[in-house]
Amino acid sequence: MSFKIDDYIKGDAFEYLPRMPDKCADLVFTSCPDLSQTEFDKTSDGIRSYQEFQKKATKEFARIVKTDGFVVICQTDRRVNGSILSNHMHYAKCLEEEGMHLKDYKIVVRNEVGKRDMYYFTFQHMLVYTYKGTITRKGDWLRDIYVDKQNKVLNQSVWSQDFCDYVIENLTNDGALVVDPFAGVGPVLWSAKRLGRHYWGAELEEKFYNDEFKQFRTTLPV
């Protein structure tokens, strides 16, 4: 399967990522599928398989990002089997094993603060990794907590365009290539397109694939 920029495809990211050139992306900005959104169950074997899936993804991210580019993973942890499945710590470990460094870290509040939930946290961990990239620390980027007004499409939370713009504008320049391999309805890709960046992304599930970004052009209130 071929790879071309400015493309949002319906398909398996792992069929395309290996075809992407080394060090081609300025920004990989994504939220990998949650355990509940995969084929893996909550058994010890299932969780190990899920973590291998996460590791496989981060190895590709670390390969395709430029030396001065960034990998941004924004994901929540989960309560599973009476303990915490610390997704953000596992992603950090995997990226650091690839030689990347944690350049910045923020909390992204995705629900109202203080909401009570048995299984889901109300915030996401935003990890910003790079090999040698630099960030201009000024203005809004200095905040360490970002309150995002997210919407739901079925069981998937959708980042606001304000949040996507915030990350892309602070970490890339015009003409940069922004990649979201687990694009969902495509908020990162739509933001990149509007901001004059190149983009590439994939979504496996028909129920989330937002062909030609139609939901952003019409009904999705993000």
Regions found by a protein language model. Give the residues of each.
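Conserved SAM-binding loop
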Residues: 212-213
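Conserved phosphoryl-transfer catalytic core
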Residues: 217
